[in-house]
Amino acid sequence: MASALEQFVNSVRQLSAQGQMTQLCELINKSGELLAKNLSHLDTVLGALDVQEHSLGVLAVLFVKFSMPSIPDFETLFSQVQLFISTCNGEHIRYATDTFAGLCHQLTNALVERKQPLRGISILRQAIDKMQMNTNQLTSIHADLCQLCLLAKCFKPALPYLDVDMMDICKENGAYDAKHFLCYYYYGGMIYTGLKNFERALYFYEQAITTPAMAVSHIMLESYKKYILVSLILLGKVQQLPKYTSQIVGRFIKPLSNAYHELAQVYSTNKPSELRNLVNKHSETFTRDNNMGLVKQCLSSLYKKNIQRLTKTFLTLSLQDMASRVQLSGPQEAEKYVLHMIEDGEIFASINQKDGMVCFHDNPEKYNNPAMLHNIDQEMLKCIELDERLKAMDQEITVNPQFVQKSMGSQEDDSGTKPSSYS
């Protein structure tokens, strides 16, 4: 090894042994150029460092190896990164979260390029667990994990990181970017959409759309299109966005989504034939946006919505009559819809196979069983937890020096007095 590299290894060992992590972070930030100039010796450097004891030094070397324009031996580097993430010291890498997250981004990009997303899923799950201070903390690696799960069509590994409500963001030494936040909620919404958990999907798309913004984001635009479609499938109408939504949405994003607004407008007429005509008219747009599958589900949900409307008018109805009223092709298709809706708990009915009559029933749920009481208890606990969280956040803001300074300034402006100077 060159003398400069030997000095780097010795410094990493010494600072790690002394527990001087801040100084070690400064060293690895300055050593990028040195390591890049000595690519052929980097595996020797890795051999001289212990992953557990010298995690930050190993991280610096792997980051530089992955930063090179071309990777000569990807399989070796992949194995090195896999071993590092599974065995590194979590307390150490939290001093260099920006570099650690950067390494995960590089790994993700390399696997996406090679069309091997499945290989990175378990590695990124380990990386998130190492980096998080708590399970409610969002990191930029969350977006990478969701991206790989989507590309691999393997959604379930991401669910433990989506089902929790995020209360905090890992700043990553200033490297956390709004793009990571938007991608987490956009990809998360797509995963929930794929699993037909439309309620949670709608919430995730809403988070992406309502992110404070001063410019148009393509991620926000795509989230908005899916938000409209999922709203129609879940609620039968487009759910109104919160008042705090950025003006960017109304001014720029809505005009770029005209086909989707037309779809929502025609959907509200409850006429499937007109909706089919509009889908055919804008099929190129929907296909280009990769939303044709959701659009077809909108059409299917309109049939279901119209069947639900019949339950408020009729006690019994023949399948033939239902098919003509709802504009289905015939009694067989009507029966298929009714059976699926009964199975999903969307209507309460029974079909008499002898005469093809559908009998609609009242909701059998009396809301007095132990399971329902347990659900109510769980919802109450969530409300209590939310109240405690809000109180803690309020207290945190109250003692924040910037908030106190602004509050004092506004009070002085209101009273017309000038701030006093103390010596």
Swiss-Prot record:
Pfam family, one: COP9_hel_rpt
Keyword Nucleus: yes
Domain PCI: start-end pairs: 197-365
Keywords, sorted A to Z: Cytoplasm, Nucleus, Signalosome
InterPro entries: COP9_N, CSN3, CSN3_C, PCI_dom, WH_DNA-bd_sf
One of the protein's GO biological processes: protein deneddylation
PANTHER family the UniProt entry points to: 26S PROTEASOME NON-ATPASE REGULATORY SUBUNIT 3/COP9 SIGNALOSOME COMPLEX SUBUNIT 3, COP9 SIGNALOSOME COMPLEX SUBUNIT 3
Family, similarity comment: Belongs to the CSN3 family.
Name of the featured protein: COP9 signalosome complex subunit 3
